[in-house]
Amino acid sequence: MRSFLNHGLIALASTLCSLPVAAQVNTATIFGTVTDPSGASVAQAEVTATNEQTGGVWNTTADAAGEFTLTFLPPGRYTIVVRAAGFKEKRTTGLELVAGQRVRLRFPLELGQLTESVTVTAETPVINTASAQQDHLVATLRIQELPTMNRDWTTLLQLGAGLVVSNNAVAMNGLPPDGFRFTVDGASASGSGESETLTSLGYIKAVSLEAIREVSVVSGIAPAETGPTMSGNVNVITKSGTNEFHGSLFENNRVEDFAARNQFLTSRAPLTFNQFGGSLGGPIVRNKLFFFGVYEGYRSRAFAVVSGNVPTKEFREMVIAAQPATKAFFGTFPLPNTTYSPGAVTGFYQSAASSKEDNDHYSVRTDYSLTDTDLLSVRFTQDWPFQFTPRVSPANPRTFDVKDKKGVVNYIHSSASWSAETRYGYNRFERVRLDHIYSLGVSAIVGNLGFSNSGELMENLGTNFSIEEVIAQHRGRHSIKYGALYQKYSSGRNNETVPEFRFATVADLLANRPTQITISFGVRPYTLYNWILGYFVQDDYRVTDRLMLNLGLRYDYFSVPKEKNKRLFNRTGPFGIGPYTDPDSIYDANYLDLSPRLGFAWSATPKLVVRGGFGKFTSSHNHFGGPVELVQNALDEPNRVVFSQLEAQRYGITYPTTNAAVLPLVKGGGGPIAGTVISRHFPQPYSLQWTLSVARQITPDMSFESAYVGNHAVHANIVRKINQVDRITGLRPFPEYSEFRYYEASESVRYNAWQNTFRRRFAAGLQMGAVYTWAHTISYTNAANLGLPNPPQDTWNTRADKGPSPFDIRHHFHTDFLYELPLARLAGRPAGGGRLLLGGWQVSGILTAETGPAINITQSTTYESSRPDYVGGSPYLPDAESTLQYLNRSAFAKVPIGGGGAPIRPGSIGRNALRALGYWNLDLALAKNFQFGERWRLQVRGDLFNSLNHTNFSGISTGIDSANFGRFTSTRGARLVQFNARLSF
């Protein structure tokens, strides 16, 4: 059996020798040195690591320099035994290891007989002395004990330096949020299959909190085995069974009776939320075969605040009288419920509307010690989230219906001379998103007049799988890893949008004279696929006992996307004004993506470490959900076409219409040529990163680190709008073409930061962490990402849009704590009922404070991303928190409109030129623990989110055309109370 497995590993490694690295690290590594009492090295010492919870054993032998490396150690608590002739046996117990950790340890031996033994308790280092990477660990204690809304563990990621969590993605060190890598047990767990996100939908983010052992975040100068990613990796490690049965039952509940009133509502909105489930793990065969399973479900019935501009009663009556066909569209809107000026087109509507969210989720994992040197792990996860989200239009809610399946098989082989890890990952998703106005068949009116209501049906499904191999060897002072990966993505998609009409003025609407019409016929069902190939090598070189060098190189090849039936067409020529390309080669492949990594860790003293380095990190473009999905997939039938005012008149298109009615006009080249275009030169996005930090161990349990972190991201997406109508005449430069999007990889993002981290691990009843970051991020688009960014205001002057990125937060502070209240000790340790009453109390919390994000002032025209002029004076108004009017309308002026509804020139105000208000919040939790015997524990806890009920305004209306321009329309939530009961053993 062992011989077969060993030969299989070697064959697999040979097969994959040209593939990329394992993107994420599930295991820990120990770099050890064995010495005698004088400090001289001890050669040929036998080293054994035993997992205290499962009985798993790893063996190696120190070399002539007394050096050894233990690799691929699953997270857990270990006993390390060192034996050498002429010395007493050294036994180090209680060494806690986490995923991705690389620890340097010394094992000094005492002279004596092997029959004698010296036992010590391990002190896991609190500072990193082995590598330059930035680590943020969310361990079991923080996951279980800190307050998390709806048991959402992803909110704890922002407790790390340089991490900003937004819209289910993570911006690491200012880099594009879809440039990170999200994995569970090392295998891809991206929810949508289109971009890296922390979830496809719902509260359960890829895996239940109950199943999580720890979450490891690696960024900065990560080793070459981390990739492909341009910013970093979030890896969730799930729990496994042990030799003891352990499990839990929990109930999480929220009701409106204990919640504060939303600041924009007159009464508390009804709310019923229940989250429930449990776990069970243990041995099937002691020391050999283990299992762990989790079920979690939630049912949410709540009222969400919906707000926006809606047509006034007088305006809609006037339009319907002139154009009766608009009655169905205006009937989808409620009437304003706030005061508005006589003759106004729109008024403001705000109310509470019913929302619904359900999910059922389960996860099963088994771990099998095949032999003393071979470990096999298998995990499977599935969930069925559903979501109903209300919007301003009661007739147009959005629903999601999703099915997700994820699995991973992991195999570890270890020996004295080499070790290896093999992983197979699988991810299958099905998603249907429906805007209900689509079902009504109503043509939409969007844009300039201050109100919009449109709808789409999107069906999306796909699969991605990967196979990875990593081999580790120890050669003197060199610990070498090399590995490979093959990962294939496939995605099918079908989507269609209702016709969208834009009218520049009220007079145009009354005359049914559309300024612009966008028809999205939808993409015929298709299957896109691409793959990643490459390899890496990593050498951790112990130059001296005080200096470690991390030398790495990885190569990545990202294939050009293809369509299963060769139905993918791109155009060539200057900015896409040319013939179609080969469907199997929509842009030029790049074969030279080499990414060097260089890091160092220098222990100036045993308690002071200087770390730093430089590296290149490469990602794939977000093809699915990005530009590729919009590329025309039929030569005779576009998926989207945009008609100018003159073109609409030429073809006789007026409100309303249907996609089916317009299709004959453009099918077979009968109308303007449409379709999105991707530049032939479309290199992969990458970042250049550099760091320098100083870390100090304050006590055995406390540390402080201060770091400078910088990076420069290159080749993220920019989209230009090509063949727009002339700003004055309203004519297109190339009349035979429609307006279309042109994607090129020319975005640049720069980030500089000073990051400071304080950590105190749990000791004497107290755990604490604090992070302060000063940072500045600059980009050229208002959605700097790898998928669908916003176009620049001026297509031919993208550099004029240089400004703060949308996730530029200048000052950011977080602190978290867990404190076991010493009430029983202060009361003299009472017995019986007194101990039951006073013992087991704890308090925990998270304090967040940050300055406001950038906000972008816009003007609605046929030129997307248009901005108005700044005409002087303060853009902000005083007493905004009392009046709710934050921006000063008189400081801005609309740019006059020319031909075809286009502004006659770009507006003068810069992109993201203004700032929103800052944010601060304190979440608290108070818990009482009841202990029954040695193993059973019941925790009853109350979580208070926004415990002080501080109003943090958000939702600023930034469109100059809006009647509510500059007003706050929402908050980031009033106080909520969540009750949780959890029984564990």
Sequence positions of predicted segments:
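Solvent-exposed loop/turn elements at secondary-structure boundaries
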Residues: 166, 441-444, 563-595, 600-744, ...
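Residue-level signature of outer-membrane beta-barrel architecture
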Residues: 219, 238, 282-284, 368, ...
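Short, solvent-exposed micro-motifs at the edges of structured domains
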Residues: 272, 560, 660-661, 671-690, ...
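Periplasm-facing N-terminal accessory domains of Gram-negative outer-membrane beta-barrel systems
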Residues: 2-6, 11-139, 208-210
